[in-house]
């Protein structure tokens, strides 16, 4: 079984997260796919950023939703990088992408781009929110979806199935073999996040995971040889 390695917000352990520089480095590092996060700007652009506000990762302050794309462009997202929009990432790298959305509104905006650019084969959509997963699947037939969870109950596999997700992305610190086996029995894949040490990588392989999200290029290099 192949083990997929996803670059977390590019390779945020060595580059400014969710920037074109980080995504290009992730692709050059041989990541199987690149994970990123999307929020809608005030004027409806799909801004690539993890947090709901810009404070942590830029030299600005305030919510993304309160700023236009032009205002977001003025901010430094690290080492002179600007906040990209999703369409720019599509042009900057050719890797498969896993795009995390935070709500139904973002699902609808992303659905438009996926349909217009025929990206069903390249873009996988993930969310912590069941309703966002359900909505993107409704809007884009055939799109691959991922339900993410940091903490979960005994119903997490049933939740993923109900939302139409093909994959569960679960916190490696809380993952058990029982959950992985339940998911696999229902033909769901399981990705562990975030795998940043050799011990965590060995755990991911011992749990028979289908892949892992990592901040560091070296996890991709060593992951190919870890049994």
Language model segments and positions:
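Phosphate-group recognition and catalysis centered on beta-loop-alpha active-site segments
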Residues: 1-227
């Amino acid at each position: 079984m192949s083990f997929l390695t996803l670059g977390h917000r590019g390779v945020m352990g060595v580059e400014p997260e969710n920037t074109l520089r980080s995504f290009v480095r992730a692709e050059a590092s041989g990541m199987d796919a690149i994970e990123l996060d999307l929020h809608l700007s005030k004027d409806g652009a799909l801004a690539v950023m993890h947090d709901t506000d810009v404070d942590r990762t830029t030299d600005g302050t305030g919510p993304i939703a309160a700023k236009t794309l032009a205002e977001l462009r003025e901010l430094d997202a690290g080492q002179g990088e600007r906040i990209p929009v999703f369409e720019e990432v599509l042009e900057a790298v050719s890797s498969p992408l896993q795009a995390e959305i935070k709500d139904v509104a973002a699902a609808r905006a992303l659905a438009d781009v996926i349909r217009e650019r025929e990206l069903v084969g390249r873009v996988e959509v993930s969310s912590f929110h069941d309703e966002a997963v359900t909505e993107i699947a409704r809007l884009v037939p055939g799109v691959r979806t991922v339900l993410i969870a940091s903490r979960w109950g005994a119903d997490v596999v049933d939740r993923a199935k109900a939302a139409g997700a093909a994959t569960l992305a679960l916190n490696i610190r809380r993952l058990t073999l029982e959950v992985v086996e339940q998911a696999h029995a229902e033909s769901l894949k399981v990705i562990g996040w975030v795998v940043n040490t050799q011990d965590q990588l060995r755990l991911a392989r011992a749990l028979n995971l289908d892949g892992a999200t990592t901040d560091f290029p070296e996890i991709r290099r060593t992951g190919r040889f870890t049994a």
